[in-house]
Amino acid sequence: MNGRDELVLRCAQRRREKIGTLSDEGFAELCLAVRENPAAFVDSPEQASFATLVSALDAFRRAGADDDLLDDDEFRAARARRLQALSTGCAQALSQDEGCLDARLVQVLAAELGPDDRLDALLEVEGRAGGSADLSLGATGDAWDDVFMRPRLRLWGAIARTCLEGSRYRMALEVSRGLMAASPVDQVGGRLTAALALARLEDEEGFNELDARLSGHENCWLNLGRTILIYKLGRMNAARRALRGYGELCEGAAYALLRPTYVELYLPDRPEVPAGGFEEATFAVHEAEPIIADVPDFVSWADSFPWFHAAGESFSEETGYDW
């Protein structure tokens, strides 16, 4: 979530509603004015609450800038303090506007509940927000274009990922498909969760349909999911080719699979990272961990190919990461 940009859009949209008729050029100028001084346009509990949340998230990220310099015990203690401060910020945001959906979402995620308890909490948040009936595609046919609908999309994304983590693969797929239907642009990444769920369900037809929909937009989730799916179906020659494609798509993809690295909580949604970069590979492997755990020989099979092992080891040497 780009909180600062969304705060600008929220404030500008509410101010346009008060002004009445405003041309596109006029709205663009209004957005520039809001960006110069957002605080001057925060004129309701709704916007004040969102601004408080954005500040809390910014503080959480700034406080973790030097985490790499800490030893394990220091890191755990510092991270616990940061999460507690973030939770306090969410509580403050909710005291300003109890309807701030993003604050409720972040509060649940920051509690680091297990997948079952987290899903219960997220579904409770959704229920309190009025359920899916309130989600509108708007005039453009994409809910993402309405900045006030984005919190609901982020909530659905978190529900889908939590379902995947908790081995509720059909529910993860259903919610992900709902996300893609509500927002075809899919900024939240429902297609990514769907790819992994389809792989675990061994739904080759559904996976191929998703692949066709994303034609020309390859990503690490899709390529890793394809490799797992074909491996589970026992087509080993095709699985080997898919593994090679996965390894060649993203920088450090082999290392990410063979030596999984720590991934911080998504607060509140999956961070945007450069396509084809190492972070994309680490995110995909992290989200696929519950599926990979169900296929215990998959990683050792991948590691058995000298070219794949060498790619991972080479990336380790280039970056200085542990091997």
Regions found by a protein language model. Give the residues of each.
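Extreme N-terminal leader/anchor segments
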Residues: 1-86, 92-95, 243, 308-323
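Flexible helix-coil transition and linker loops at the boundaries of alpha-helical arrays
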Residues: 39-45, 90-98, 124-149, 180-182
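Residue-level recognition of tetratricopeptide repeat
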Residues: 48, 86, 93-103, 169, ...
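Residue at a conserved register position within TPR or TPR-like alpha-solenoid repeats
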Residues: 59, 107-111, 163, 198, ...
